[in-house]
Amino acid sequence: MAKKQEYGNESIKSLKGADRVRKRPAVIFGSDGLEGCEHSVFEIMSNSIDEAREGYGNKICVTRFLDGSVEVQDFGRGIPVDYNKNEDKYNWELLFCEMYAGGKYDNGGDNYEFSLGLNGLGLCATQYASEYMDAEIHTDGYKYTLHFEKGENIGGLKKEKYDKKDTGTRIKWKPDLDVFTDINIPIEYFQETIKRQAIVNDGVKFILKNQTSASKFETFEYCYNDGIMDYVKEIAGDTAFTTPQYWECERKGKDREDLPEYKLKIKSAICFSLKNQLKEYYHNSSFLEHGGAPEKAFRSCLLYTSPSPRDYAAS
């Protein structure tokens, strides 16, 4: 006889705190496997990239350690972690321990005009999904440090005077095998992801360090001063039979008449090659594997503006 299933009022449960991510990581990261773990790493990188895109810092360092831990360091403004009068809480509690808390919800663009991160989810979710996380922030003349273990803060916020002029954020963490089935992210993921971010973030230098033994690291640097234009020239090389062309424009748009305006920036580069074939599209610097709407828009624009054979015949 089949076991009788009891399903009553007491059967309903609410996940709280770190369990909201630790028990269901795929809801946030898309998977509880290696892909989800990779996604969590990209979320921390995204916050640093957003700072650089706004003009705060032009270098981002990413370190891959042998034990599966990762460190991301930027030289931006530094995450605000001190007391927030409007929320009557410390910002570190909001950013590291609460979902949907962040500085990217203002469509007016006062904090970030264009953002790559998950808007208040990525940092907190990655912290929740970590075996441990350490954060060090330099901002406003202070050094702040935080330590977390399995989604829980240990020791509160530590704050001390910092006399040096540099600002920025350094976060080191180890994805938790209790959350993800695999945390051994291959070096190729870091190389491919970071190179793509260097391509679409003009002039930002990305330094990737990969630990190969207890005391040795190999280093890779990625920087495209002219962004996608440099990349197109690199791919075409001496096989190009047209001069690389570049277009850039900024506009404002609305999804509906009664909704607020948002800013739109478009960058395009194109070159025809005798040998190499490549099409890549990005949205908010996120690589679009299948092209999506940006590819359709670019193809339509290119066909619409290209002269027809009749135009050549007439001339």
Q: How would you name each of these model-derived features?
A:
Residues A2-S11, L66-N91, G102-A236:
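GHKL-type ATPase core
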Residues G17-A18:
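Alpha-helix capping/hinge segments and adjacent helical runs
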Residues K23-V41, E113:
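Conserved short strand/loop->alpha-helix "switch" segment adjacent to the catalytic nucleotide/phosphoryl-transfer site
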Residues E35-Y56, C124-Q127:
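Conserved ATP-binding N-box helix of the HATPase_c
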Residues N58-T63:
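A conserved short beta-strand within the histidine kinase catalytic ATPase domain
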Residues V179, I183, Y282-P294:
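Short histidine-centered catalytic/ligand-binding loop motif
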Residues L264-L274:
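Short beta-strand elements
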Residues Y304-S315:
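Single conserved hydrophobic/aromatic residue that forms the stacking wall/gate
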